[in-house]
């Protein structure tokens, strides 16, 4: 028996079985879930109705995540799955699905912020900087260039909860694409009330 997306195999509310109007049709077919896991990039092509194509991601290790308040997007490494509203089993098995809350590497976003604003982000006072970071933050700039950075720095404030996350080197993000259909795990960084909500959910789950 194949996976079918029809409704006539279900019983009536009274408990009676529905009559079978016809055999299964090609347009009613369903496919097994992709169950995308964290690992070295592995994507398969699936031919669909009308000769169209879907990209079935079996393993993914990175994705494009947008930082909405800063209007920037960076490709970053996926570290772990943290929370899933539908099923804890998907968290335990580290399955990447649309709507999953995951942790991603904060480094690309920190590098962008420090290059864009010429300000350190979530760094300890008097902490030793690498040569690369030192070249960005303490670079000699012309008066004209500094004027541009000074103007940018007026809007450089970052949410306190987000700074805490930058300190750990991990950011919470939500997957907004369907990895089993588009072959990518793209999403956005959690901020503000949404971040606060999911932090409370994760803490409550750990406390059990």
From Swiss-Prot:
GO cellular component, one term: nucleolus
Pfam families, per database record: Ribosomal_S8e
GO biological process, one term: ribosomal small subunit biogenesis
GO MF entry, a single one: structural constituent of ribosome
Superkingdom of source: Eukaryota
Location(s), subcellular: Cytoplasm; Membrane; Nucleus, Nucleolus
Alphabetic keyword roster: Cytoplasm, Lipoprotein, Membrane, Nucleus, Ribonucleoprotein, Ribosomal protein
CDD domains for the chain: Ribosomal_S8e_like
Gene3D superfamilies per record: 3.10.290.70
Major location (coarse): cytoplasm
InterPro entries: Ribosomal_eS8, Ribosomal_eS8_CS, Ribosomal_Se8/biogenesis_NSA2
Membrane topology: Lipid-anchor
Family: Belongs to the eukaryotic ribosomal protein eS8 family.
Role this protein plays: Component of the small ribosomal subunit. The ribosome is a large ribonucleoprotein complex responsible for the synthesis of proteins in the cell. Part of the small subunit (SSU) processome, first precursor of the small eukaryotic ribosomal subunit. During the assembly of the SSU processome in the nucleolus, many ribosome biogenesis factors, an RNA chaperone and ribosomal proteins associate with the nascent pre-rRNA and work in concert to generate RNA folding, modifications, rearrangements and cleavage as well as targeted degradation of pre-ribosomal RNA by the RNA exosome.
Subunit structure comment from the entry: Component of the small ribosomal subunit. Identified in a IGF2BP1-dependent mRNP granule complex containing untranslated mRNAs. Part of the small subunit (SSU) processome, composed of more than 70 proteins and the RNA chaperone small nucleolar RNA (snoRNA) U3.
Protein name: Small ribosomal subunit protein eS8
Taxon lineage: Eukaryota, Metazoa, Ecdysozoa, Nematoda, Chromadorea
């Amino acid at each position: 028996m194949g996976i079918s997306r029809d409704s006539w195999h279900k019983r009536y509310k009274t408990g009676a079985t529905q009559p079978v109007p016809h055999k299964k049709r090609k347009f009613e077919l369903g496919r097994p879930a992709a169950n995308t896991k964290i690992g070295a990039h592995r994507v398969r092509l699936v031919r669909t109705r009308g000769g169209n194509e879907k990209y079935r991601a079996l393993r993914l290790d990175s994705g494009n995540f947008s930082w909405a308040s800063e209007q920037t997007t960076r490709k970053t490494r996926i570290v772990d799955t943290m929370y899933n509203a539908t099923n804890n089993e998907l968290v335990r098995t580290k399955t990447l699905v649309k709507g999953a809350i995951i942790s991603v590497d904060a480094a690309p976003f920190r590098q962008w912020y420090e290059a864009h604003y010429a300000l350190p982000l979530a760094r300890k006072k008097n902490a030793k900087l690498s040569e690369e970071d030192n070249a960005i933050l303490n670079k000699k700039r012309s008066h004209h260039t500094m004027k541009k950075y000074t103007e940018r720095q007026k809007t450089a404030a970052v949410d306190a909860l987000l700074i805490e996350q930058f300190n750990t080197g991990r950011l919470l993000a939500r997957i907004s694409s369907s990895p089993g259909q588009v072959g990518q795990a793209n999403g956005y960084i959690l901020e503000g009330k949404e971040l606060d909500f999911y932090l409370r959910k994760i803490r409550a789950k750990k406390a059990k």
